[in-house]
Amino acid sequence: MQCVQYTAGHCHSCQWLDKSYSHQLSDKQKHLKQLLQETSVTHWLSPVMSKTSGFRNKAKMVVNGSVERPLLGMLHRDGRTVDLCDCPLYPQHFQAVFEVIKVFIAKAGLVPYNVERRKGELKYILLTESRANNEMMLRFVLRSETKLAQLERVLPWLQEQLPQLTVISANIQPTHMAILEGEKEIIFTGQTMLKETFNGIPLYIRPRSFFQTNPDIASELYATAGRWVRELNISSMWDLFCGAGGFGLHCADKETKLTGIEISAEAIDCAKSSAKSLGLKSVEFQALDSTHFALEKAKIPELVLVNPPRRGIGKELCEYLSRMAPKFVLYSSCNAETMAKDIAMLKQYRIEKVQLFDMFPHTEHYETLALLILD
């Protein structure tokens, strides 16, 4: 992948851009094998490769510059703004959308927030696309509600220019800290979420719910989890840290008793919408802390699926799983180092198979799926 900003030394988000893609995959697989060298692994499966450009479905842009000539991109360490509208990680058609958004910012008088001076209103714009129908969600992250009336006044123009923007909202983030979003979300459109479809499974994206940024690889990851679980012929499972329900909904059929747990109420609403669309009757999704939910249960299903944040599932949950000993644990991880530490605590399990999914090309990061069987 060629990147003008990387070559010029303006952006180094893709730390591995100088490596060939085959070299990147080789290094990631080697890293994963080193982390799991103390654990018994029956089958090492080949890594799942990504497209090397145009694979992201979401752009998170810092807004800077002036209200007349806003810049969308990132803040350099020296304080300069790097405009990333032509970033090759995004599909090419994002560029035209960014240009219209810049005009809208000027028309609405949304003054970009200046970190140094602590002045201005517009901090970020977040743009997400559904690959299922090409609809888009646009979020404006504002310091306050001061400019909402101005924003709403010019909104019809924006919707006329970009009819694919079916969900538009403002998030209010008043603190002067490196926090992406605040608690308050104001939705301006009748539609409140995007519909995505992976492998025939409807999934929904709401403004504040997490969703994978590489849909092709996410689709492969969910499909693989579904295949592995169906081969086990189980009748009950938990999907902990379930997000919008992607894993559990790919694994469950109409007879499977599935319980999905996720701290985000927005994500749980999305998961419930998906389950309803699929007509699943034995599925339950709850907005709870996954670890607390598990620790309170005296019985455990045949399979526990975990997809934790980067910190992993931690000692408490590992000790609980060791004590309760479900037949299977399916572990999906965005941080193989914490996953390896967790698996090392699950001493009575062996890894039946493990596979690397290259969710984040040109970086050291990757996703891992590991099936653990009670030995």
Swiss-Prot record:
It comes from the Bacteria. [4Fe-4S] cluster binds at residues 3, 11, 14, 87. InterPro entries: 23SrRNA_MeTrfase_RlmC, MeTrfase_TrmA_AS, MeTrfase_TrmA_CS, SAM-dependent_MTases_sf, U5_MeTrfase_fam. The keyword S-adenosyl-L-methionine applies. S-adenosyl-L-methionine binds at residues 212, 241, 262, 307. GO terms for molecular function: 4 iron, 4 sulfur cluster binding; iron ion binding; rRNA (uridine-C5-)-methyltransferase activity. It catalyses: uridine(747) in 23S rRNA + S-adenosyl-L-methionine = 5-methyluridine(747) in 23S rRNA + S-adenosyl-L-homocysteine + H(+). Keywords: 4Fe-4S, Iron, Iron-sulfur, Metal-binding, Methyltransferase, rRNA processing, S-adenosyl-L-methionine, Transferase. It is an enzyme of class 2 (transferase). CDD domains: AdoMet_MTases. Gene3D superfamilies: 2.40.50.1070, Vaccinia Virus protein VP39 (3.40.50.150). The active site is at 334 (nucleophile). The keyword Transferase applies. Its EC number is 2.1.1.189. One of its GO terms (biological process) is rRNA base methylation. It holds the Pfam family tRNA_U5-meth_tr. HAMAP family: 23SrRNA_methyltr_RlmC. Belongs to the class I-like SAM-binding methyltransferase superfamily. RNA M5U methyltransferase family. RlmC subfamily. Catalyzes the formation of 5-methyl-uridine at position 747 (m5U747) in 23S rRNA. NCBIfam families: meth_trns_rumB, rumA. This is 23S rRNA (uracil(747)-C(5))-methyltransferase RlmC. It comes from Xenorhabdus nematophila (strain ATCC 19061 / DSM 3370 / CCUG 14189 / LMG 1036 / NCIMB 9965 / AN6).
